[in-house]
Each structure stands twice: as structure tokens, then as C-alpha cells.
Amino acid sequence: DTITVGECSGVTLEEAKKYARSDEKELNMVFQFEHMDVDADADNKWTDKKMDLREMKAVLTKWQKGLEDIAWNSLFWENHDQPRSVSRYADDSAKYHDVSAKMLATCIHMMQGTPYVYQGEELGMTNVPFTSIDQFRDLDSINAYRELVEEQHVFTAEEMMRYLCRKSRDNARTPFQWDDSAYAGFSTAEPWIMVNPNYKEINAKKQVDDPESVFNYYRKLIAQRKEKEIIVYGTYDLLLPESEEIYMYTRTLGEEKLLVVCNFSEKEVAVEIPEEFRKGSYLIANYPKGEIKEQMTIRPYEAFVLEK
């Protein structure tokens, strides 16, 4: 068996419906990038603009509802051309790193479509604290620095380094962090690019046997998709579209229903739980499970899924 995936940068919803219709033979799914532009200016990605969660929800919901019963979504936060999601959309500090990585995984893996996990994402690998343009290997980053700093003087060197550390593709292209040995266990020789200095804290060896690790949380999410048809085939409906902190949606398949709640902020946020879920149970959670009740306080970067 084979599947066909079309990398369709700039594709419209109507075009995607034509390319990946379930009753046609062109593609099995489209890989579109509209949600990757939420934290960029219209004509410039080199910025430290933060994501507006309301806009992110609107874009992802457009694709969830627009392809429903017609075509199939690819679900992703990361790839080789994007920075690390835990640094980009959440909080990669030691305090919130693990819950942030698990929250992002919950949000995307509970949607309709096929999730893609980019190498290192399942560990919560982070952006890299580059300090010099000489440390970069990505031509897009190197050329942008030359043009915008040295030739056109649009940004100072300090400004551009800040933007590169946030958005450069090299953030996702450092060696995979296997263990805490030299070069993160990737090689016995010096790699082509620096290893992220946090490799002793974030690596596969440390996480594989830890039941509470980001890695094993991903395993749980993937197992649930194989066990529960509602995660694969259920319809998606957005709740709280105007919330600047909470991404909440439901999945429905027949009489089954799931509620997905994700806090994209470091604030504690009070949320009203829909009545039909108040006597439900947890499917998965990235914090110790609290009592399910009408009003719940959602902790920083908390995520959970309730079954009706």
C-alpha cells in the first residue's frame, strides 16, 4: 500500500479539495502551511511577532471544517523548514518545557487528519541559542543576515540574531539528541552544525524509560488514535473562538464525544466545562488530573481530553 502527500505551499481550501478528494485519485492528503504564517508579517518572516491564538484557531478550524467529509488534512507543528514548536508557540523554559510540549502534541493529535512528528519533536527539542551568524548553515538565514544587516541596514546585528534564533530553519536542523554523551550521541566526529547545548537534559535515552516523559506522552497519543475511531473520524467543532489563551474543541462520532482543552499561556484561566462532559472521564492529561466540574481552572500550558 502507498499514500500520496502533496506539499502544497500557498494552496487554497478549494484547491485542496480538488487535489485530495477522497473519491478521486490525485492525492491522499495535502500538506498546507497557512497556520505557519500566523506569527509572521505579510512580507517578512524575520520578526519576533508572537502568535495570536485566535488567528491560529481560525486557520486550523477553516481546514478542519473545510475538508470534512471531502478530503484529508496533514497535521503538524514542525518540519525541516520550521523552528521548534515548543519554543515558537509555548514555553521552553525548564519550568514549563514538558507540559508545553505535551500540550502542543495534544492539540494537534486530537484533530482530524494524519499527524506528522518531526524528528526530535517527540522529545520536545527546542530552538538553539545561537550567538553568531557564523554558527548558521541555512542559506536562507545567512543570506537574510547579509542583505538585511550588512547591505540594506534594515536591522542591527543584535535584532537580526534575535529573529534568527526565533525563526531560522537551523533550529530544526541540529543533530538529534540521542543521549548525554559527546555530540549528543549523534556522531563520534564533530557534526556540521552545533549541537543544542541542552542535550544533556533533553535526549532520547533520558526519556524512553521515563513514563512521564514527553516521548512517552507521544506514544500514548499515537496509541489512542489507533484505539479510538472518534479521534480519526469524528467531526470537529471549535469552542471559545475569541479566547486569547484557551484552544477548546469537540470531536463527535455518533453518540461518542470528546472535549479537548489546551491552555497556550502561562496564566491560570477559568473555563466553563460544557454540561455534557461534567460527568465524563479523562482520556489523557499533561498534569495530575483534577476534579471535573462546571468551572475549572486550567493551569499554565495544561492540556486534557475528556470523554463524554
Stretches found by the model and what they are:
Residues 1-281, 285-308:
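Active-site and adjacent substrate-binding regions of carbohydrate-active enzymes
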